[in-house]
Design a protein with these regions (language model features):
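Short coil/turn segments at secondary-structure boundaries
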Residues: 55-58, 81-82, 168, 204-210, ...
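Noncatalytic alpha-helical scaffold of FAD-dependent oxidoreductases
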Residues: 1-167, 171-211, 222-248
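Iron-sulfur cluster-binding cysteine motifs and their immediate structural context
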Residues: 203-208, 239-263, 297-324, 501, ...
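Acidic/polar loop patches that form or flank catalytic/metal-binding clefts of enzymes
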Residues: 162-168, 191, 202-206, 242-255, ...
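Non-catalytic terminal/interface segments that mediate subunit docking, oligomerization
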Residues: 44, 50, 57, 64-120, ...
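Iron-sulfur cluster-binding electron-transfer modules in prokaryotic oxidoreductases
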Residues: 199, 315-640
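Non-heme iron-sulfur electron-transfer modules
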Residues: 210, 247-290, 311-337, 624-632
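Ferredoxin-like iron-sulfur electron-transfer modules
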Residues: 181, 216-236, 276-300, 540
Length: 640
C-alpha cells in the first residue's frame, strides 16, 4: 500500500501507477513471520518499479485505517461529483493474467467518453474490478453518452477478454441488456425458460437478469435531486445504516435523505406548476409521514456522520429541519432563563413519582402515563421502570478537600436532576463519586455556586431551538471562564454529550474542557491503586464518546477495573438521545433490541458515561447501568 504522501507528490506519480493492499494471516506467529519474509522477498524483486512501499504491520489501528482508505474509494467519488449527478459503480471480472491490460483499456474508455473523475479498484487476486464514475441523466446527450460507454465496456469485458460482466454483485437492471451478449443466445434461452417455469407471471424482481428490452438500462433513471447542501453529496451507499438506532423502527439516514430528495423533487414540480394530481397526493403523504418517520424518530446524535465516507451528518440535517419547523417560543425561552427552578421542580416531581409507584405499582403508572401522553399529544413522557428519583441538591454534596491542583467541575443537567439508578448497588450521587476520586489524586474540586442554573444548551439544540441553546452555552462559558481563573484550571463535566457540545462550541480554547473519563484516565488513574476485579460488566460506549475519542478513555477506565468487560455486538447509538427516550421509548427499544440477550447470567452491572443513556440501557437490559467512575471509586485508593 502507498504510504501517506503529500498531495503534490501524489500528483507527480507516474501515469498508470497502482496501489496494492496486501493482507495475509497464519495460524501462529512463526508461520506469520515466515510468510512476511517470503512476501518481502517477492516485493524486493519489484524494487525498481515501486514508487513507495508501506511496511507490513500487525497494528490493528493501522490495518483498519488502510482498509478504511480502500473501502472509502467508492463513496469518496460522491464527495467531488457535481450536484444532481449520480454515482455509478460496475463490477466485472477478467482472467488475472489480463488484469493489467484491462485496467489500461478501461482508462482509455474513460478518456474517450469523458469520464475524467472515474476510478478503478477491486480484488486483484480474483481478477475482479470495480469502476466508479459520475453521470448526469438530465439531457438526451448525457444519456446517449452513458449508453455508448456501457456498450463499449460490456463488449470489451464479455467478448474481447471473455470475462464476466458481474463478479461479486447481482446483474441488476443496468447489465440485464447485456446478459445475452455475454452468455450467448442458446444459454440465454435456457435462462429465460427457467425464469418462465419459476415465475410465469413475471412478478419476481421483473426486468433483472432476464429483460428483452436492450435499452432497459437507460430508462426509468434515478435523478439525484438537489435538496439541501448538507446532504447533496450523499450517494446513498448505505454505510451509515448499520449504526442508526432507527434502523428497524422507521428510516435510516440513507432513507431519510432519499425520501427528502423525492419531497424536494415534487416540491419543485409543484412550484413550477407541472405536478400531476397523483404526484401532489404523494407529496402530501410524504410530507405528513416524514414528520415522524424522518424527523421525530431521528436521534440526531450524528453517529451516521462517523460512518459516512464523505462526512455527511444526517442528524445535523434533521436538526436544521427542526429549526425550520420550530421557533424559540416563550415556553422554551422561559425554561432556559429559569432552568434552576425548572430543575428543582423536576427533581421534586421525580421523587413524588417514585413514591406513587411504590403505592400503585408499575402497571398502573404505565397505563396512567400512556393515557396522559396520548391526551397531551406526547408532551407528557411515557413511564419507565428505570425512571430514577430526583437527585440531591449539588450544594449539599460540594465538600471537596483542599489541594494545590484544582479542577472546575460542572455536573451535567442529567446528573443534577436524576438520582442514581433505583437498583444500583451504589446509590451515591455521581458528584460524591467524582469528588472522592479526585481527592484521592490530591486534586481539589471547585463547583461554582451558579452551577444549578447552567446547561450546555444541547437539549435546546437537538430540538432546533438554536437561540435558547446559544444563550445557555454563552452563560455556561462565562461561568467556567471565571471559575477556572480564565483557563488556569481545567474544566470537567460528567456526561459525554455535554462535554462534546462544549468542546465543539468553545472557539478560542481559553478553557480546557474535559469529559470526565478522559480527565480521570489522563490525570487521576496513575495516582490510584486499583484492586482489579474478575466480575463481569457490560460496557456501552456513547455516541459522543465515539465522536470525541472513539471511546478510548471510557474503555481504558473499564479495563483498569475489571478483567471481564463485555462490549455487546450490534449496539451503537442507544437511541435515548437526551430526553427523546422519555417521549419516544420505541426508539430506545429498537436500538437496544439485541442487548438483553447478550447479558450473561453472572452479570448484574453495566458501565457507561451518560446518565440519560444509562436510564435507557437499564430499562432495556434488565441490569443496572452506572458511570464507570462508581466502579473505579469502589476499587481504588490513593497511592500519592
Amino acid at each position: 500500500a502507498l504510504v501517506t504522501l503529500p498531495e503534490d507528490y501524489i500528483d507527480a506519480l507516474p501515469e498508470g501507477s497502482t496501489a496494492l493492499l496486501v493482507e495475509f494471516s497464519a495460524d501462529d506467529q512463526n508461520q506469520l513471520t515466515q510468510l512476511e519474509q517470503k512476501l518481502n522477498g517477492h516485493i524486493a524483486k519489484l524494487e525498481s518499479s515501486l514508487v513507495a512501499n508501506q511496511l507490513f504491520t500487525t497494528d490493528s489501528k493501522v490495518i483498519a485505517n488502510l482498509w478504511k482508505i480502500r473501502k472509502g474509494m467508492f463513496p469518496a467519488v460522491g464527495a467531488v461529483r457535481a450536484t444532481g449527478t449520480t454515482v455509478v459503480i460496475e463490477d466485472v471480472a477478467v482472467p488475472v493474467a489480463k488484469l493489467a491490460q484491462v485496467v489500461k483499456q478501461l482508462h482509455q474508455l474513460f478518456i474517450q467518453f469523458g469520464y475524467d473523475e472515474a476510478i478503478i479498484f477491486g480484488h486483484a487476486l480474483s481478477g475482479n474490478l470495480h469502476f466508479v464514475f459520475t453521470q448526469a441523466f438530465e439531457t438526451a446527450s448525457e444519456i446517449e453518452r452513458y449508453h455508448e460507454f456501457m456498450d463499449a465496456v460490456s463488449k470489451m469485458i464479455a467478448i474481447d477478454y471473455q470475462g464476466s460482466l458481474k463478479a461479486e454483485h447481482g446483474t441488476g437492471r443496468n447489465m440485464a441488456p447485456f446478459v445475452e451478449m455475454e452468455w450467448g443466445s442458446e444459454l440465454y434461452l435456457v435462462m429465460s425458460k427457467l425464469k418462465q417455469l419459476f415465475d410465469p407471471q413475471g412478478i419476481l424482481n421483473p426486468g433483472v437478469i432476464i429483460n428483452d428490452d436492450n435499452k432497459a438500462h437507460i430508462k426509468h433513471l434515478k435523478i439525484m435531486t438537489k435538496a439541501d447542501d448538507l446532504i447533496d453529496k450523499c450517494i446513498e451507499c448505505g454505510f451509515c445504516e448499520s449504526v442508526c438506532p432507527s434502523l428497524t423502527l422507521t428510516l435510516t439516514p440513507r432513507q431519510r435523505i432519499a425520501v427528502w430528495r423525492q419531497i424536494s423533487l415534487l416540491q419543485q414540480k409543484h412550484q413550477a406548476g407541472v405536478i400531476t394530481i397523483e404526484q401532489q397526493q404523494e407529496l402530501n403523504t410524504l410530507q405528513q409521514d416524514y414528520q415522524y418517520f424522518g424527523i421525530d424518530s431521528c436521534a440526531a446524535t450524528g453517529l451516521c456522520g462517523q460512518q459516512c465516507p464523505v462526512g455527511i451528518d444526517t442528524g445535523l440535517f434533521i436538526k436544521n429541519l427542526r429549526t425550520k419547523s420550530h421557533t424559540d417560543g416563550k415556553v422554551s425561552q422561559s425554561i432556559a432563563k429559569r432552568f434552576e427552578s425548572v430543575s428543582t421542580i423536576a427533581k421534586f416531581g421525580l421523587s413524588s413519582l417514585q413514591l406513587a409507584n411504590k403505592v400503585v405499582g408499575d402497571k398502573v403508572m404505565n397505563h396512567t402515563f400512556s393515557a396522559m401522553s396520548k391526551v397531551s399529544g406526547n408532551l407528557i413522557p411515557k413511564w419507565y421502570k428505570a425512571w430514577p428519583a430526583g437527585a440531591k441538591p449539588t450544594s449539599i454534596i460540594n465538600n471537596s478537600e483542599k489541594f494545590t491542583d484544582k479542577v472546575v467541575y460542572i455536573p451535567a443537567c442529567g446528573n443534577r436532576i436524576f438520582a442514581a439508578d433505583n437498583n444500583a448497588q451504589d446509590k451515591r450521587a455521581i458528584q460524591e463519586v467524582i469528588i472522592s476520586l479526585l481527592n484521592k489524586a490530591h486534586i481539589e474540586v471547585i463547583i461554582p455556586q451558579q452551577t444549578d442554573k447552567l446547561c450546555c444548551g444541547m437539549p435546546w439544540q437537538s430540538k432546533g431551538l438554536n437561540d435558547s441553546a446559544d444563550a445557555k452555552r454563552q452563560e455556561f462559558l462565562k461561568v467556567i471562564k471565571q471559575a477556572s481563573a480564565q483557563g488556569k484550571w481545567p474544566v470537567i463535566t460528567d456526561a459525554s454529550p455535554c462535554a462534546l457540545t462544549m468542546k465543539v462550541e468553545e472557539e478560542n480554547d481559553a478553557v480546557s474542557i474535559y469529559e470526565i473519563s478522559q480527565f480521570v484516565a489522563e490525570k487521576v488513574l496513575g495516582k490510584l491503586a486499583v484492586n482489579k476485579t474478575d466480575e463481569t460488566f457490560m460496557l456501552h460506549t456513547t455516541c459522543s464518546s465515539i465522536k470525541m475519542d472513539d471511546g478510548q478513555f471510557l474503555h481504558e477506565l473499564a479495563h483498569a477495573c475489571s478483567n471481564n468487560i463485555i462490549i455487546p455486538k450490534d449496539i451503537y447509538c442507544c437511541g435515548f438521545a437526551g430526553d427523546k427516550g422519555f417521549y419516544q421509548p420505541e426508539l430506545n427499544k429498537a436500538a437496544l433490541a439485541p442487548l438483553k440477550a447478550q447479558v450473561p447470567n453472572n452479570c448484574s452491572r453495566g458501565l457507561s458515561n451518560s446518565r440519560t443513556c444509562e436510564i435507557g440501557l437499564s430499562e432495556q437490559s434488565g441490569i443496572s447501568y452506572q458511570s464507570v467512575l462508581y466502579l473505579l471509586d469502589q476499587l481504588s485508593c490513593s497511592n500519592v
